[in-house]
Amino acid sequence: MNAEKPPVTHNVDHEEIAKFEAVASRWWDLEGEFKPLHRINPLRLGYIAERSGGLFGKKVLDVGCGGGILAESMAREGATVTGLDMGFEPLQVAKLHALESGIQVDYVQETVEEHAAKHAHQYDVVTCMEMLEHVPDPQSVVRACAQLVKPGGEVFFSTLNRNGKSWLMAVVGAEYILRMVPKGTHDVKKFIKPAELLNWVDQTVLKERHMTGLHYNPITNTFKLGPGVDVNYMVHTTAQVD
């Protein structure tokens, strides 16, 4: 008699999960592997809060929350936050840090597609930051995010453009020269052109409202938002009301 096959978990790259599981204990180390995320988080948070008209009192979902850097900061703004991730260890770190910080965040281990099947149209704001390039089917994630947001609600995506410049800066520069992130963090083949992302958005109820680039200056060691989406970029969309 054949042994039962383990259940299939759709749209999960277990090698990607393993990368982040291995370094999860250092998620909140401001000088560790996740230092860039800590550095850019005020920019991400400010962009999301400003374009959402503030986060206080809103129900927010952070898709691919990892160790909870963005999720916790949105909760500090007065939002009711759910953090979603498929990595067990990052979620344990996120839960412990929230407990130690006295911040309430509901962390859940499941895919965004599974969550959408149970919680359609329940969130005022959905964020999906630096996650699309780590899953086998990013378009499926976009569809699920569109299902989860309320009509008139906000959905934010951030990812990396796919071109020679982004490979040089995000892979060669960030991983091998500046060593800002661990080697192997990114695979340029999984990067997503803005036109591709907007095409997926257009196939849902979402409508693009704004796009901005995230830029790093190695001379001043600073990040800023501004025109130009040839490397890192963020997209703000809203769910259309029938």
Curated annotation (Swiss-Prot):
GO biological process terms, semicolon-separated: methylation
Top-level taxon: Bacteria
GO molecular function: 2-polyprenyl-6-hydroxyphenol methylase activity; 3-demethylubiquinol 3-O-methyltransferase activity; polyprenyldihydroxybenzoate methyltransferase activity
Pathway: Cofactor biosynthesis; ubiquinone biosynthesis
SUPFAM superfamilies xrefs: S-adenosyl-L-methionine-dependent methyltransferases
Keyword annotations: Methyltransferase, S-adenosyl-L-methionine, Transferase, Ubiquinone biosynthesis
Catalysed reactions, semicolon-separated: a 3-demethylubiquinol + S-adenosyl-L-methionine = a ubiquinol + S-adenosyl-L-homocysteine + H(+); a 3-(all-trans-polyprenyl)benzene-1,2-diol + S-adenosyl-L-methionine = a 2-methoxy-6-(all-trans-polyprenyl)phenol + S-adenosyl-L-homocysteine + H(+)
Cited InterPro entries: SAM-dependent_MTases_sf, UbiG_MeTrfase
Enzyme Commission (EC) number: 2.1.1.222, 2.1.1.64
Function of the molecule: O-methyltransferase that catalyzes the 2 O-methylation steps in the ubiquinone biosynthetic pathway.
Entry protein name: Ubiquinone biosynthesis O-methyltransferase
Species whose genome carries this gene: Citrobacter koseri (strain ATCC BAA-895 / CDC 4225-83 / SGSC4696)
The organism's taxonomic lineage, starting at the top: Bacteria, Pseudomonadati, Pseudomonadota, Gammaproteobacteria, Enterobacterales
Gene that encodes it: ubiG
